[in-house]
Amino acid sequence: MNPQKIAVLGPGSWGTALSQVLNDNGHEVRIWGNNLEQMAEINEKHTNTRYFKDVVLDEKIKAYSRLDLALENVDAILFVVPTKVTRLVAKQVAQVLKHKVHILHASKGLEQGTHDRISTILEEEIPAQLRGEIVVVSGPSHAEETIVRDITLISAASNDHDEAKYAQSIFSNDYFRLYTNTDVIGVETAGALKNIIAVGAGALHGLGFGDNAKAAIITRGLAEITRLGVAMGAEPLTYSGLSGVGDLIVTGTSIHSRNWRAGDALGRGEKIADIEKNMGMVIEGVSTTKAAYELAQRLEIDMPITETIYKVLYENLDAKSGILDIMRRETRAENEFININK
């Protein structure tokens, strides 16, 4: 493939790491953000020290604070902004974009209120004549590892196989490998919902529980996010792949995960408002918990772990009491794994 001009919207840890991958593959990368000091740092010092203290970026990666300039003559746009601002940024893109491009996103969350997936937001806000089918790029990936070129394998899902292949071709190299997928709903919901379970896994660690409990929350968490995903139209097999169990393992077991760290702090008795302030980064699992809980209520899907985490986050339930509530639930068979009514 010829070198592409690619705008990466969102200069956070993952947006920065993906920018480096694309740059390594010979593409012209333009990072866009609205923090003028951060954009100047990337351009002048070739660093993004808010997220990576010791990483020097290639000087060919350019940062823009003006969206119209960042999008000028690009071949593709990669959204890596927080879920809560995705719709706003998509509206801005639609206002200044002058030609048809490939649209990809690597964000993980559900919109508050609407419960929309990211691809749904992008489809609603960016006119069809300006884009192809949306591509979801998601899977087990810590930005801290990708930025130092550690091996990473993730999924690229789209309703148009050619669009998924495009994503695969611009990203894949010796350390970063994409697999195509057609289950957009599955890949997208798996990436969003696993953040909830990661908060719970971190809380167990903060409470002092061991590996048995952590394995339990990951496997039972996988069961309930699969139930919700299938109810939304996903294929159950997707949740056993990279974007499902793969992402759940990496996010639910590692200190690199901000969702896990937030849960760990919750388990040690800290309040979520203080945790978010101290971390200084978006914790997608917090807002996703609320959206998923409301969606599960609407669809009548049983999600006991999600419900408990919701009560800890939004109703001041003590985390240890929440664990006991789950353990005291009526016993049942394990083989209701995919049964969306259990």
Swiss-Prot record:
Pathway where it operates: Membrane lipid metabolism; glycerophospholipid metabolism
Entry's localization field: Cytoplasm
InterPro entries, alphabetized: 6-PGluconate_DH-like_C_sf, 6PGD_dom2, G3P_DH_NAD-dep, G3P_DH_NAD-dep_C, G3P_DH_NAD-dep_N, NAD(P)-bd_dom_sf
UniProt xrefs under Gene3D superfamilies: N-(1-d-carboxylethyl)-l-norvaline Dehydrogenase, domain 2 (1.10.1040.10), NAD(P)-binding Rossmann-like Domain (3.40.50.720)
Principal location class: cytoplasm
Domain of life assignment: Bacteria
Broad enzyme group: oxidoreductase
Pfam families per record: NAD_Gly3P_dh_C, NAD_Gly3P_dh_N
Binding site for NADPH: S13, W14, K108, A143, R258, V282, E284
Reactions that this protein is recorded to catalyse: sn-glycerol 3-phosphate + NAD(+) = dihydroxyacetone phosphate + NADH + H(+); sn-glycerol 3-phosphate + NADP(+) = dihydroxyacetone phosphate + NADPH + H(+)
Family from the record: Belongs to the NAD-dependent glycerol-3-phosphate dehydrogenase family.
Protein name: Glycerol-3-phosphate dehydrogenase [NAD(P)+]
Record organism: Lactococcus lactis subsp. cremoris (strain MG1363)
